[in-house]
Amino acid sequence: MQINENKGFPTEIPIIVEDELFLYPFMITPLFLSDEENLKALELAIQGETPILVVPTKPQQDGARDFDGIYDAGVIGTIMRRVPLPDGRVKVLFQGIDKGKILKQSGINPLRGIVDMLHVKRPSQVKTDALIVVLREKVRELSQFNHFFPPDLLKTIEESAEAVRVCDLVSSALRLKKQIAYSFFVEENLEQRLLKLIDYVIEEIEANKLQKEIKNKVHSKIDKTNKEYFLKEQLKQIQAELGADTSREEELEEYRKKLDAKKKFMAEDAYKEIKKQIDKLSRMHPDSADANTLQSYLDWVLEIPFENVAKKKSSIAEVSKHLNADHYSLEKPKERIEEYFALRELLELRGVGEKVNNGAILCFAGPPGVGKTSLANSIAKALKRELVRIALGGLEDVNELRGHRRTYIGAMPGRIVQGLIEAKQMNPVVVLDEIDKVGRSYRGDPTAVLLEILDPEQNNKFRDYYLNFNIDLSKIIFIATANDVSMIPAALRDRMEFIELSSYTPQEKFEIAKKYLLPQELKKHGLKPSDVSISKEALELIISDYTRESGVRNLRRRIADILRKVAKNILTKKNEGKISVTAKNLKEFLEKKVYEIEPADKKDQIGLVNGLAWTSVGGDVLRIEAIRIQGKGSMQITGQLGDVMKESAQIAFSVVKVLIDNKKLKVPMPIVPKFDDDKHKLEASDVYRRYDLHLHVPEGAVPKDGPSAGITMATAIASILTDTKVKHDIAMTGEITLTGRVLPIGGLKEKLIAAHKAGIKTALIPRKNYDRDLVDIPAEVKADMKIIAVDTIDDVLKNALVAKK
């Protein structure tokens, strides 16, 4: 299509917006169109066989497709070819013909405007020729410094007779910023445009001359073959031109002094690596990115306390003293810890201290708040070592432990090395907290690093990626903590020796509150024993009705709640003299009761059985209900139960069916439904064929799972199918097999404590638990409750069902 500047303009034409290119009339340019507005403008131009205007977006307006985000001038041209691409874009070949200016906005989606051509005001031919000569001369001079003007382009500029075209050629080659390119583009006065271009080219020449001069100055001072050194010296020279201070000898000298002071305490490879990095830093300019990274590295590594190792040896007496002073009860864990450190002390006394760490790593396992971290703190105090806690919960990135390579932005040492720096010791006590909650992701498996850290054969040469040298971790005492041992990978479990910390009994919580928590909280709140007292009954009420946990964290919080109110009352003078908190006035200091264990029913019922459950905050009484409805022998199970518990219910149903078939359970025939079309005499087995059972575990919002309710569900089913009451003051726990055997379960201590709180008088437990775990049950529980060992479901039903008269 030919555009005649004397015909058809101004006229309305569609507008394509270009984000990256600044086009000129003489160009044939491929454009890649993907957005809806540009594609619509393209279709409009093709269908109407009209020219099209391509305009650039303004700076920081890439992606804009409205008149506010674009310049009001561009190139008028035609579409030579259109090719759809597989990715949905359209490639067009655009031929620029002339410059155009938007006079008026006439539409959007697509953009359309009334466009007229830009009319050039030309000076006299003599002046134009003179300016063109100067411009060509300056362009030739500039081409000596950069590659903006290849020979073919220079030849075209020299041979072109059209001044406007020469200006466009030079402008397109200079790679101008959009604002500058636009100001040159819309300049209608040819003389002014030539002068602006000449000035710009002269500025570029001067800038390139200065750059070359700096290079020459540097080049004369250094070895031409040392490219890296050349670049750094060049940067120095530039900074010198800007007046920057490059002196840093004092800082480098400080690094060298620190390194020399630590030299005799560190390995040879560590010393060489740090010295190498100091020397490298001395050759860098202080403002370079690499210098900042290297300086950060030296700040880290020279803080590692190579020279500081705690001299205190293991002392069983000190360990025992601190454990007993800081912790009530926990006799078995304390005994095992004392044995562990007795071995260390014996090895040290006999001069084989280097073998001390060749034993298993201690891991304190138990519910939250039972004193796992506190035990580690007591050990650290006894050994006069610093305690470093490293939280592993949710850790997925292996670099968090091993350190980040220095090539990454924000790189730093791993948490182990950071812990040594924090402790200012090379042999602190390091607590690896919540080791059972370590994750894994595409960034690696932290478990593999932990295996190396905890292996006495490997951890004397642990390599942190950030440090880039080996560091000795063998002097560290590692102690792990976990809530659920089963979640720890097998290889890691093999490295550790587990010390179980179970839930505290109410009596233990009372003693802990009286001897530890209350004195500590009084001190923390600025109170004295003469200011406030909490009665025994009030403390017992707080433990039973205001907290439900395995440990004592919430108990500490409730005591703190009381003391804050006491402090307020003292300051507002609401109370004169000593404030006494009793069971009667406890509600004035704490809100309503939060927890309350439902007491056992006071009468025997059919289909209602007390089971026992273990939770993360202790034990609980789990009441299981069963009803029968005339039907076809199916069973429905509700209460948000897991798969294991559902399977236990099915097994229990099958076991009871067998007992009925074998006449070990007597079914009163009057309860068996009769049908009009019965053709055979009713049998006991008809009771489970003609009834549907519904088994329910209350508190349906709480998920429940596990096999330990097996005998409880079997008892409920047997009770409802034989119309026999279950003793109201009995509770039970145990897994049932298809042959009626009772298998052992876990969490017995917590379960029996919960039963004791609920007023249960008799507990049925598996024989193996009776023989193995009864020694761990608190004395007050065993004194108040009859505990019966059962081997089979027959034993369970014999003790649980009320004998019929």
Curated annotation (Swiss-Prot):
Can you tell which superkingdom this protein's organism belongs to? Bacteria
Q: How does it assemble?
A: Homohexamer. Organized in a ring with a central cavity.
Induction of this protein: by what? By heat shock.
Localisation: Cytoplasm
Query: Which catalytic residues are annotated?
Result: 708, 751
Q: Which residues form the Lon N-terminal domain?
A: 13-205
Q: Which reaction does it catalyse?
A: Hydrolysis of proteins in presence of ATP
Q: Which cysteines are joined by disulfide bonds?
A: none
Q: What residues bind ATP, as annotated? A: 366-373
The record's principal subcellular location, in a coarse class, is cytoplasm
The record's NCBIfam families line, in alphabetical order, gives: lon
Question: What Gene Ontology terms describe what this protein does at the molecular function level?
Answer: ATP binding; ATP hydrolysis activity; ATP-dependent peptidase activity; sequence-specific DNA binding; serine-type endopeptidase activity
Job of this protein: ATP-dependent serine protease that mediates the selective degradation of mutant and abnormal proteins as well as certain short-lived regulatory proteins. Required for cellular homeostasis and for survival from DNA damage and developmental changes induced by stress. Degrades polypeptides processively to yield small peptide fragments that are 5 to 10 amino acids long. Binds to DNA in a double-stranded, site-specific manner.
Q: Can you quote a single GO CC term?
A: cytoplasm
Q: Which residues form the Lon proteolytic domain?
A: 603-803
GO terms for biological process, alphabetical: cellular response to heat; protein quality control for misfolded or incompletely synthesized proteins
Give UniProt keywords alphabetically. ATP-binding, Cytoplasm, Hydrolase, Nucleotide-binding, Protease, Serine protease, Stress response
Spell out the InterPro entries in the cross-references. Answer: AAA+_ATPase, ATPase_AAA_core, Lon_bac, Lon_bac/euk-typ, Lon_lid, Lon_proteolytic, Lon_Prtase, Lon_prtase_N
Q: Which family does it belong to?
A: Belongs to the peptidase S16 family.
EC annotation? 3.4.21.53
Its name, as the record gives it, is Lon protease
